[in-house]
Structure formats: structure tokens, C-alpha cells
Amino acid sequence: MMASASLLIGSYLLLLMLLARPLGKGLAHLVADRPLHGFATAERGLWRVSGVENQGMRWQRYLLAILLFNAAGLLLLLLILMNQASLPLNPQQMPNLSWDLALNTAVSFITNTDWQAYAGESTLSYFSQMAGLTVQNFLSAATGIAVAFALMRGFVNREQGELGNAWRDITRITLYVLLPLSLLMALFLVSQGTLQNLHGYLDLTTLEGAKQTLPMGPVASQEAIKMLGTNGGGFFNANSAHPFENPTALSNFVQMLAIFLIPAALCFAFGDVVRDRRQGHALLWSMSLMFVAAVVVVMWAEVKGNPHFLTLGADSAANMEGKETRFGILNSSLFAVITTAASCGAVNAMHDSFTALGGMVPMWLMQIGEVVFGGVGSGLYGMLLFVLLAVFIAGLMIGRSPEYLGKKIDVWEMKMTALAILVTPVLVLLGAALAMMTDAGRSAMLNPGTHGFSEVLYALSSAANNNGSAFAGLNANTPFWNMLLAFCMLVGRFGIIVPVLAIAGSLAMKKVQPAGNGTLPTHGTLFIALLIGTVMLVGALTFIPALALGPVAEHLHMSGH
């Protein structure tokens, strides 16, 4: 088992880095806002027709463009979901969504969360899935990458204050990155057996004589961007555990690669943009070390399983509950860590059925801000916030003014960094407290005791950090939970984007200071250790008390302590 686990983790990381390096080079080209060879004329025509000016924006204008763009997407998606019964491509005659579920779903998809308080195959029409959810999967991913581009430019621009043009960034990211990759991914998934049609559902008679309905639909086209954009919202309720979404072991492995592909490539792009590849490599090393540690813990916990299984007469204590036999424990554990380290939230196994420790690690990966590779764009700018915090702590220890990449880190940057890092913990902890204090919150819990609290904590962690996965034992489709989680998703997304762009704008106004003898190297082993320690320390201080009431207590109870 250890050899299989090592081979799986090693082959995954090797292929990931081989694919991410060339993509990172292309992303760096987009950050520089240079026209692509052969597309310059078409681009100029597109900008003229759309009225987009070829000039940079300061951080306030960049932020306003991002907010207006996402507000328009929210309104359009809300209208589609609340009127889907009157729209085309609805062969199953799906009714309109209630206002609270429609609002929750619209907020979920424009924030790249893809939290789903519904079952897609029994709730949404094909039009809602294609024109509503799939479109927002592209646009929310492009938004995150655009913000990361703006922050990168903040580090390299000198006394300009401009961060690029948000409209150009979102358009170019969608056309040159997300669409081509999604097309290739969709074709691959179709070759593996993923559905892609507009047929009505099939009514069949099984060999036992029972009646069964097989859902159909344009699955592969949504599945591709769901993974590449770290969106995670499944066409079916079972998500990537469903054989119509994820048919084979090969499709499962490629889906895992797709989740981390753009986040890893952005780290390589960061090194190219700042003209020091070691900076990007340091981020990748930090992320990879934390990732491997998390995978090892989850695999160990699930293989060790539950000792009560043996007392009940099972052949093994290994925990196969909630997992597909075609994927097994190792692939399910790896997928769980990948999807929660990123802001994806897609699942090929039910996280609610993991052991207490096996479920706690994915929850904790979300709680630290999903900075272990993280979401497309959000993972990079989230980790760079921790880099600024680590540089500040190091500056306090050695008595020097903190600086990073030649830019001095002042009070303004640290205030914005602290604000961004504190947004999601406040949402999670206060939201969990509110849910446990109210009848409307507690009534949705289908399990009592420590595991019930873990389900509540997981839901708030997932929503506030824009992940979207869930412990399924929570009945979240109620007005209370739809509104609470929608609020957490909105604030968790844009409450971080605002200070990140403010930091980028401030850095873009500064001179680059030449490195001196006392400058802290931010690419060596010492800084990697400091960065990992900073992430771990913030996560530990913030969430250990809450985790102790949930998964830790559940594990001790399971172990007989």
C-alpha cells in the first residue's frame, strides 16, 4: 500500500509540473499584456467593437470593473434560474427555482464556489446548466486569474500605479487559456465515456424488471471547465463520483491534474514575471510540501479506518464507506485533498463518510485559505498574502523594515494583509456560532453530537473559502442556510479581492529598492520553512478550538479515549 501511495503521489506531482511549466510561460506572456502572434489584428478589432480602451487602470478602477462584471453575472444567472420553466432546452420540464435557492446558487457560481444545495439532474434544465452555470464557471475563473495578474503587476510596475485593464485581462484569459484547455479536456472526457448530448432522460427496465431513469445532458462541456477553473459544481448530485461525469480511472487522474494545472502554472508565471524564477519555485515547494503531508495523513487515516468495523465482523478496518470501488481508498483520498487544497470542491467520494481525521484535513485545508495551490488566481494571491505576513514577521525578528522583491512593505500593506487573512475565519467562526445558536440552523443537522457540529463547521468553511464541497449530512436547502451561506460566499470572495487589489495598487506606486546585505532571501530553504510555519501557525491559532469540538473529539471517541 505504501509503494502504491508513493507512486501515485509522485507520478501526479511529476506530470503536474511538466504540464504547468509551459502553461506558466504562456500566462506570463498574458500578464505582460503582449499581443499573441497571429491574433493582434483580431484583438484590435474586438477592442474597437466592444469599446474597451487600451489603457491601464489604477486599483480602484480595476476593482470597480471586477465588481460590476460580477454583479451583472449574478443578476443574469438569477433571472435564468428563476425563469427556467419558460426557457428552452428543458425536456424534463424542470420548474423555476425558489428565490432563496436561486440566489444561493447564483452567488455560488459567480464567486467560484459552486456550492450546490440541490441535485442538478432533478432541479436544473439544460439551458440553466449551459447558459447559466457553465458560463459563470468560465467567468468566475477568469476573474480570479485577472486579480492574480493585477497583483503580479503590482510587484513589477514602478511608480506607475496601474495594474492593467480588467476587461482586457478577463477577455484574454477566457479566450486564450480557459476555452482552449476546456475544449481539449471536454473531448478527452467524451472519449472516456462522459455524456455530451441534449436528449431527454431515458426510461429503462433493468434485468430485474425494475424501472429506472437515466439522466442525460451536456455533461462533458461543463465538467471540463468545472475542473480547470477549480469551480467544482457537478452536473449530477454525486459529482465526480458519478460514472457519467467521471467514467474511468484515467479520467479520474486527468481530472485531478486539471484542478491543480492553472494554480501551479501561475506560480511558474509569477517567477517569470518578477524575473526571478526562484521566487515561483519557492512558492511551489511550500505548497507541494504541505500538499504531500496532507495527502499522507488522509491516506493513513482512511487505510487505518475505523476499529469498530472489526468488532462488527468486517474483514478489514479500512474505510471504504462513501467511496467508489473503481477508485479505491488511495485515489479517493488524493482527490479529496486536491479538491480542498484548491477551491474546487468537486468530489469523487463522500467526504462526510471519511474518518474523523480523514475528514478534518480537507476541512483544515479550506480553513487556512486554500493556499496549497488553491483556486485559479485565488491560490496565488492568497499565498502571497502569507508571504507578506512572513516577510513582516522576519523583519520584526531581525529589526529591519520588511520588503519583498525590492518593494518596501509598509503599514498600509500590512493592514490590508491582516484584513484579507481575517475575513474568512471571522465568517466561519461567527457563522458556525450563529447556526448553533438558532433553531433554524440546528434543525438542518441530520446527525447529532460532534459529527453534526463538524458538518456545520465544514459547510461554513467551504462557503467562506469558496470551495463548495460539503459534508452531506446537512440539509442546507432552507432559507436560513441559503442566505447565510450566500452571504459567506460573497464576503469570502470579494472581501479578499478588495484588499488584494489595494495592496497591488500601493506596491505599483513604489520604487524597487536594490537588495543589500541585510535583505531577507525569499527563495531559499529558510524562507520556505518560515512561510509554511506562518501558514500553519495562523491556521492552528484560529481553528484548533473549533476543530477540537468537532473532528478531534469525534476521533477520540472513535478511538475509545
Swiss-Prot record:
| Membrane-crossing residue ranges in chain numbering | 1-21, 62-82, 132-152, 173-193, 253-273, 283-303, 327-347, 356-376, 379-399, 416-436, 483-503, 526-546
Report the protein name in the record: Potassium-transporting ATPase potassium-binding subunit
Q: Where in the cell is it found?
A: Cell inner membrane
Name the InterPro entries on file.
Answer: KdpA
UniProt-listed HAMAP family = KdpA
Specify the species: Erwinia tasmaniensis (strain DSM 17950 / CFBP 7177 / CIP 109463 / NCPPB 4357 / Et1/99)
Output the lineage of the source organism: Bacteria, Pseudomonadati, Pseudomonadota, Gammaproteobacteria, Enterobacterales
Subunit (UniProt): The system is composed of three essential subunits: KdpA, KdpB and KdpC.
Q: Which domain of life is it from?
A: Bacteria
Topology class, membrane: Multi-pass membrane protein
Keywords for this protein: Cell inner membrane, Cell membrane, Ion transport, Membrane, Potassium, Potassium transport, Transmembrane, Transmembrane helix, Transport
Name the family.
Belongs to the KdpA family.
- What is its biological role? Part of the high-affinity ATP-driven potassium transport (or Kdp) system, which catalyzes the hydrolysis of ATP coupled with the electrogenic transport of potassium into the cytoplasm. This subunit binds the periplasmic potassium ions and delivers the ions to the membrane domain of KdpB through an intramembrane tunnel.
Its Gene Ontology cellular component terms are: plasma membrane
